[in-house]
């Protein structure tokens, strides 16, 4: 099969996006596409037409056509299979099959087309692999960003907690008719109330702003910042200033959850000479009225050996999954040994695993539409009121053995209507006025904290608050597949090993 070009065009033959896989001029491809509508015979059910030099294989998509231009001696069955893959790629990047939407995402489509065909020949890829390749996803980068964002949120939360304590102390002192104490009296390291307020204000505000360069140190002389020991109103002004900057004063329940999240972040894993990475990624789509449209989970065990004396080993796998996952071992792994004894070892026991490289020894896949398999259910209830919409969002953890960390539930908002008015909330929130989104942030969701809700009001229509997107990380995998023991092939002696488990979100949407 030689594929000359792939294009999306209108019914009149106007090219919207076209990718040529062989050397071809713009005039040539435009001429081929312009001639295409004239060759079609509406009275026939064929999805291909031929000329003296090329063959058009096409599929209608509402008002557009997905067209493949191939040589006449290509395999028509392979052409049709490739055409179906091209047609499935387009809805992945375009919400509507319209000319404006295709033009807006033309580069994304071209990158995806290049993953399907190389130099005119079809690559052996599926839709999930195309999505992964075009996203250029990095697990390490996601983990690094998640840890950094959590540290920033914890620092902001601590500053807000201190500000609230200062405000409460001031009010208590005013009730008793006393003047609130300042922050002096600690010897040579004494700090005035004014400089402390300046430090707190600067820390909280700077956290949300991109850091261009390190801020210069403030002089220890007189400061024009707020002085907490002066007037009672200045403390209230300080808190109001936080609110005007878009910050939210944290409640006591939020402080409790933040402390729990800080306990979760353990120091980096001490990697042994035999190290395993167990990674799972979930793709899930639910309907706003309930029902699981699709859930797909991919998992893999990656083995890394840093000492060649441990090259000839076997992994003892404990599979407690009851959801019906499909397991697949590496081609060099003894499949009979794994099926009979749940041991991962090479077919030739005299050979060693590669050293200083990550080797995928076992992978699994789960695809279902069973609602009971959803790890975290999200219910979004927008109801129209006189001034706009009252939105109530609830979450519930269905898998009690999971512990989800750094959970962010992102709700789209109408543009140009201002910030939402928050009612009750479990956790904390961020309003991104540039992207018109409301982010509901929850440090930890586990069996002790398995449900919560958020209520807010804003102008808009119910459809404005979808799709809702969810992201999280977890150090417990979903399918309950673990490596419990590692032994050497000779003598069956145990080997020390370390394990790193990660459960990530690839795509989690409520449409």
Curated annotation (Swiss-Prot):
Amino acid composition bias (Basic and acidic residues), ranges on this chain: 167-177
Region (Disordered): 167-188
Modified residues (Phosphoserine): 223, 244, 493
Lineage of the species this protein comes from: Eukaryota, Metazoa, Chordata, Craniata, Vertebrata
One Pfam family in the UniProt entry: Clat_adaptor_s
Modified residues (N6-acetyllysine): 233, 241, 309, 351
Name this protein carries in UniProt: Coatomer subunit delta
Compartmental location: Cytoplasm; Golgi apparatus membrane; Cytoplasmic vesicle, COPI-coated vesicle membrane
Keyword set, alphabetical order: Acetylation, Cytoplasm, Cytoplasmic vesicle, ER-Golgi transport, Golgi apparatus, Membrane, Phosphoprotein, Protein transport, Transport
Record note on quaternary structure: Oligomeric complex that consists of at least the alpha, beta, beta', gamma, delta, epsilon and zeta subunits.
Domain MHD: from-to ranges: 271-511
InterPro entries: AP2_Mu_C_sf (IPR036168), AP_mu_sigma_su (IPR022775), Coatomer_dsu (IPR027059), Longin-like_dom_sf (IPR011012), MHD (IPR028565)
Topology in membrane: Peripheral membrane protein
Source organism: Pongo abelii
């Amino acid at each position: 099969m030689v594929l000359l070009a792939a294009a999306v065009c209108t019914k009149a033959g106007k090219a919207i996006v076209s990718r040529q896989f062989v050397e071809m001029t713009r005039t040539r491809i435009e001429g081929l596409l312009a001639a295409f509508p004239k060759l079609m015979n509406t009275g026939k059910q064929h999805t291909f037409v031929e000329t003296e030099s090329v063959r058009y294989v096409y599929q209608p998509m509402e008002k557009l056509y997905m067209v493949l231009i191939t040589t006449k001696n290509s395999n028509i069955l392979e052409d049709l299979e490739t055409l179906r893959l091209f047609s499935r790629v387009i809805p992945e990047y375009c919400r509507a099959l319209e000319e404006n939407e295709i033009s807006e995402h033309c580069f994304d489509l071209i990158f995806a087309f290049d993953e399907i065909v190389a130099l005119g020949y079809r690559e052996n890829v599926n839709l999930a692999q195309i999505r992964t390749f075009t996203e250029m996803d990095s697990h390490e980068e996601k983990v690094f960003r998640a840890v950094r964002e959590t540290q920033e949120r914890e620092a902001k939360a601590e500053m807000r907690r201190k500000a609230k304590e200062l405000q409460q102390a001031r009010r208590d002192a005013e009730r008793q008719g006393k003047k609130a104490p300042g922050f002096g009296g600690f010897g040579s390291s004494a700090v005035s109330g004014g400089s402390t307020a300046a430090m707190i204000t600067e820390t909280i505000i700077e956290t949300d702003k991109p850091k261009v360069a390190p801020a210069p140190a403030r002089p220890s002389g007189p400061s024009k910042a707020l002085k907490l020991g002066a007037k009672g109103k200045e403390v209230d002004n300080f808190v109001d200033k936080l609110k005007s900057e878009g910050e939210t004063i944290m409640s006591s329940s939020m402080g409790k959850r933040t402390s729990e999240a800080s306990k979760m972040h353990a120091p980096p894993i001490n990697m042994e000479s035999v190290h395993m990475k167990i990674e799972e990624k979930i793709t899930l789509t639910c309907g706003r009225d309930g029902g699981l449209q699709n859930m797909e989970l991919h998992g893999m065990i990656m083995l890394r050996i840093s000492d060649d004396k441990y090259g000839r080993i076997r992994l003892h796998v404990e599979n407690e999954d009851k959801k019906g996952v499909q397991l697949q071992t590496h081609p060099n792994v003894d499949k009979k040994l794994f099926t009979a004894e749940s041991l991962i070892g090479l077919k030739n026991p005299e050979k060693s695993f590669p050293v200083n490289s990550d080797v995928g020894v076992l992978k699994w896949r789960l695809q279902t539409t069973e609602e009971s398999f959803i790890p975290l259910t999200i219910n979004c209830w927008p109801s129209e009121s006189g001034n706009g919409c009252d939105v109530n969002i609830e979450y519930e953890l269905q898998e009690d053995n999971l512990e989800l960390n750094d959970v962010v539930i992102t709700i789209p908002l109408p543009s140009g209507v201002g910030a939402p008015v928050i009612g009750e909330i479990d956790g904390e929130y961020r309003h991104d006025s540039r992207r018109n989104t409301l982010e509901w942030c929850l440090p930890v969701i586990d069996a002790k904290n398995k449900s919560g809700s958020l209520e807010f009001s804003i102008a808009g229509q119910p459809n404005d608050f979808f799709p809702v997107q969810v992201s999280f990380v977890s150090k417990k995998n979903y399918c309950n597949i673990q490596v419990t023991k590692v032994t050497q092939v000779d003598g069956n002696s145990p080997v020390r090993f370390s394990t790193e488990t990660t459960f990530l979100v690839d795509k989690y949407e409520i449409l």
